[in-house]
């Protein structure tokens, strides 16, 4: 059961201050499809910003938000606590099936980082099966991500501040 008045802090790394998050259609396939991605890990958001910085873009931001978890009860949410067969199928559908779409307001689960991409490549290539992929992924310390897929879900996200990031 969700605790009443439970608020979570979420982070979004960007080269911009994002006071009013929007649903974005990505130019490449992402783990959970289109929307607005956040994480509970400040470091994950900061690392994402640092990968975008270069001689032309010298400043980025970790945008900080508050999310009212009580609102999850009124949203169509898909929650993955760890890598599972269902999570693998969901991520693979989002990444490889251009016609795949889902109607969840919020999706929560592990983020597929570089180590995870390598393991997924082995799975896609038929080198390992789904169970070996899941076992491999459970050995990693995976960071989480929240995808807000609908405007209804984004209404539960309130901007707090933006923290500057430089190299």
Features from the language model and the residues they span:
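Conserved NAD+-utilizing ADP-ribose enzyme module
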Residues: 1-6, 30-31, 51-167
């Amino acid at each position: 059961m969700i605790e009443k008045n439970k608020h979570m802090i979420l982070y979004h790394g960007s080269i911009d201050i994002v006071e009013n998050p929007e649903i974005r259609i990505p130019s490449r396939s992402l783990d959970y499809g289109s929307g607005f991605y956040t994480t509970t890990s400040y470091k994950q958001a900061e690392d994402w910003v640092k990968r975008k910085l270069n001689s032309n873009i010298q400043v980025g931001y970790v945008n900080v938000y508050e999310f009212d978890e009580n609102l999850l009860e009124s949203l169509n949410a898909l929650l993955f606590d760890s890598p599972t067969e269902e999570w693998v199928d969901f991520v693979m559908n989002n990444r490889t099936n251009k016609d795949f779409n889902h109607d969840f307001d919020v999706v929560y689960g592990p983020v597929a980082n570089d180590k995870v991409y390598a393991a997924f490549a082995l799975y896609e290539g038929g080198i390992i099966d789904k169970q070996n992929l899941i076992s491999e992924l459970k050995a990693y310390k995976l960071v989480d991500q929240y995808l807000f897929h609908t405007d209804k879900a984004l209404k539960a996200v309130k901007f707090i501040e933006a923290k500057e990031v430089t190299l």
